[in-house]
Every structure is written in structure tokens, then in C-alpha cells.
A protein has these predicted regions:
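Short S/T/G/P-rich N-terminal loop/turn motif that feeds into the first structured element of a domain
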Residues: 1-147
Length: 147
């Protein structure tokens, strides 16, 4: 299979380390995710501020999604919580946003800079979590389970 071929030759393109995570899917536009194999992924490691509970973080994430859902440029958002094999993770959890193009990512950046998105993000950084700042990755899905 194509997946076996990718796994067999992975050392030619980089060092791979396999991790086990718990994933909390916050928003997934399944038709958009299935439409293309193209992915632009923005990740950001965060750690709750002292005294902020998991329930408070969940409530903040849920309220942000409810207020922003009609403005989303991403086709997916998940919170990833490291489990096995993550002794040196860069935080307690990671925001994982999926875009279907660089254009969608840039529309999101424009919304943050000019459309009111920055206020919610700054509130999150000030009151809820210390975060590393976003990193962006671009690529394509090599193998889908249905193939």
C-alpha cells in the first residue's frame, strides 16, 4: 500500500518519532476536509496559567467557538493533549488548526489583525494560557484510511 511505502521511506525525509495523544475535536468541517488532501496546519503549544482549571479552559474554548464559528477560515480545530512518548512536549496541550490553503490561513491572519479576532486571542493569552506562538506547516495527506 501507499502508506506502507511512505512508512518504509520516511527516514529519507526526516527523523520520525511516534507519539500517542488524546484529541479533542472542537470543529471539523468534514466535507471540506474530504474535498482536498492539501493541508496547512497551524500549531501552538500552551500551558494553563496558574489557577486556571481544565473546566475553565473548556468553557473558554467552547465560548470562543460559539462566538467565532461563522467567521472561521479553518476547516478544522482540535486540542491535542500529549500522552505516551511526549516527555519533552513544549506545553500541556496544543491548538491544532487545519486550513485548506495558504489563502485561508492569510484570511485568518487578516481577521485577527483587522476583523476583531485579536481581542479574543489576547484575552486568552492574558487570562487563560501561556502559549509558544503559532507554527505553520504545509503538506498533503499521503494516505487516507479508506484507500
Amino acid at each position: 500500500s501507499q502508506a506502507a511505502k511512505v512508512m518504509k521511506t520516511r527516514s529519507e525525509v526526516g527523523d520520525c518519532h511516534f507519539k500517542f495523544n488524546h484529541v479533542l475535536y472542537k470543529h471539523m468541517n468534514v466535507p471540506a476536509l474530504e474535498k482536498t488532501d492539501r493541508r496547512v496546519v497551524q500549531t501552538e503549544w500552551c500551558t494553563p496559567k496558574p489557577g486556571v482549571t481544565s473546566d475553565q479552559l473548556k468553557a473558554k474554548h467552547d465560548s470562543w467557538l460559539a462566538a467565532s464559528k461563522d467567521k472561521l477560515n479553518s476547516i478544522g480545530w482540535a486540542i491535542i493533549i500529549p500522552k505516551l512518548g511526549q516527555a519533552n512536549s513544549a506545553g500541556s496541550f496544543m491548538h491544532f488548526f487545519i486550513f485548506d490553503s495558504l489563502g485561508a490561513l492569510m484570511r485568518d491572519q487578516d481577521w485577527q489583525a483587522n476583523g476583531g479576532g485579536a481581542a479574543g486571542i489576547q484575552d486568552y493569552y492574558n487570562s487563560y494560557a501561556d502559549c509558544s506562538g503559532p507554527s505553520v506547516w504545509s503538506g498533503s495527506i499521503a494516505q487516507r484510511p479508506s484507500q
